[in-house]
């Protein structure tokens, strides 16, 4: 008997196991860890999971949902094979583990949605975290649309923890039909502000999280315009089930204690157009977090960046680009687009709007003593959602901080 289970996995008998699990036993979900495939067999992830998906589909079981567990974001290919994928090492019932997993998922919102999710691992509610840490754990899993699997003994769970797990407003947030993952719109000091649409895309209702992962009190000053909310704004605390006073003056001010979160449902009189699009919101088709390839495209910290992050190692080939898929304009028209980038010699940048002719930017700053430089170009946006792509098909592109949009007066 092999205590490590070597030889007992799917490898080599996919059809046999799939027949048993899905045809005979009738299961419709399977979580597939990569145990042994990388360490002992040195298999390639995309190829291996594709073989398993094909074996299941060949049985007429295309309805079966797969969860890929490679303990890191595996790559954009996962979306074609699975409904969800793990993005981190296994969770532990410790604050450091919860914080680490949230950190891993802060900039992966572009890969969630339309029935596909970044899996932050099972819930450790009721296993020793402090009450405010449990609120962070459950609240952030909900607003980031992670699958929710209870990981504690329900016969011994504390009453306060059980009450949190049964919070209908947080569960509704997680199960919102749009299925979107909240993204970071502000990172100042140690605090993060995340937001996402709920109920209706481009509607007046949004979910917002003020998240303090630090060990000290954190002050938040959140302008409503960065949340794209205009006019009078109502807010409801989804953890405490309390309506808050109407937000006046266009700014939400709060202080949060260490290891805490405020999860809000916010409703405004009108929805505003975004004027800033961060690089860390972009979809990167060549991105993965496996760490196998040096100089591969990545979201990277940069203190001087508007949101504290940049995208590095763009370009070098046509398919290695950054893409913002929902750049919204109410009426369409002419805009000035200002791109903030990190100067570097011998770099170019191609910009493409709605798959039309590329704009080649080669008159760019190479002064590496500048932390951030910018260039402004005219662009035409159609009414509704627009797709903006940046990269370079023939050389490395510049690292991107963000771009801003300003409508040209007619």
PLM feature segments, named:
Residues 141-144, 149-151, 187-229, 259, ...:
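Carbohydrate-binding surface patches
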Residues 25-30, 60-65, 204:
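Loop/turn elements at helix/coil->beta-strand transitions in domains of secreted/extracellular proteins
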Residues 229-235, 246, 250-410:
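Extracytoplasmic
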Residues 14-18, 48, 52, 136-139:
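Stable alpha-helical elements in mature extracytoplasmic
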Residues 1-38:
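Active-site-adjacent "subsite" loops/lids of carbohydrate-active enzymes
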Residues 114, 118-189, 269-273:
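Aromatic- and carboxylate-lined catalytic core of secreted/periplasmic carbohydrate-active enzymes
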Residues 38-52:
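Active-site-adjacent beta->alpha loops and helix N-cap segments on the catalytic face
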Residues 47, 57-153:
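Glycan-recognition surfaces
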């Amino acid at each position: 008997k092999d205590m490590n289970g070597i030889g007992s996995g799917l490898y080599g008998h996919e059809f046999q196991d799939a027949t048993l699990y899905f045809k005979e036993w009738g299961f419709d979900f399977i979580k597939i860890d990569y145990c042994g495939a990388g360490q002992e067999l040195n298999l390639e992830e995309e190829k291996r999971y594709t073989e398993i998906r094909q074996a299941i589909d060949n049985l007429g079981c295309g309805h079966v949902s797969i969860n890929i567990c490679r303990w890191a974001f595996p790559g954009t290919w996962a979306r074609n094979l699975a409904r969800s994928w793990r993005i981190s090492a296994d969770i532990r019932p410790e604050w450091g583990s919860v914080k680490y997993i949230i950190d891993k998922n802060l900039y992966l919102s572009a890969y969630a949605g339309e029935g596909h999710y970044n899996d932050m691992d099972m819930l450790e509610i009721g296993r020793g975290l402090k009450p405010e840490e449990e609120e962070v754990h459950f609240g952030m899993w909900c607003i980031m649309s992670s699958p929710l699997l209870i990981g504690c003994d329900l016969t011994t769970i504390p009453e306060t923890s059980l009450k949190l797990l049964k919070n209908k407003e947080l569960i509704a947030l997680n199960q919102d039909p749009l299925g979107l993952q909240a993204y970071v719109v502000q990172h100042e000091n140690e605090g993060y502000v995340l937001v996402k649409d709920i109920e209706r895309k481009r509607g007046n209702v949004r979910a917002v999280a003020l998240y303090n992962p630090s060990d000290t009190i954190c002050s938040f000053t959140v302008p409503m315009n960065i949340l794209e909310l205009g006019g009078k704004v109502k807010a409801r605390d989804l953890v405490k089930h309390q309506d808050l006073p109407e937000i006046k003056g266009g700014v939400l001010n709060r202080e949060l204690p260490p290891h805490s979160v405020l999860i809000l449902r916010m409703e405004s009189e009108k929805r505003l157009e975004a004027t800033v699009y961060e690089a860390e919101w972009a979809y990167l088709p060549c991105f993965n977090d496996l760490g196998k390839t040096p100089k591969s495209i990545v979201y990277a910290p940069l203190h001087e960046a508007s949101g504290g992050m940049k995208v590095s190692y763009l370009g070098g080939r046509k398919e290695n680009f950054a893409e913002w898929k929902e750049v919204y304009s109410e009426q369409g028209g002419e805009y000035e687009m200002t791109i903030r980038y990190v100067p570097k010699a011998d770099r170019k940048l191609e910009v493409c709007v709605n798959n039309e002719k590329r704009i080649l930017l080669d008159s760019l700053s190479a002064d590496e003593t500048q932390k951030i430089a910018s260039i402004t170009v005219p662009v035409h946006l159609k009414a509704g959602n627009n797709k903006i792509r940046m990269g370079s098909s023939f050389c490395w592109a510049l690292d991107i901080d963000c771009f801003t949009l300003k409508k040209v007066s007619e």
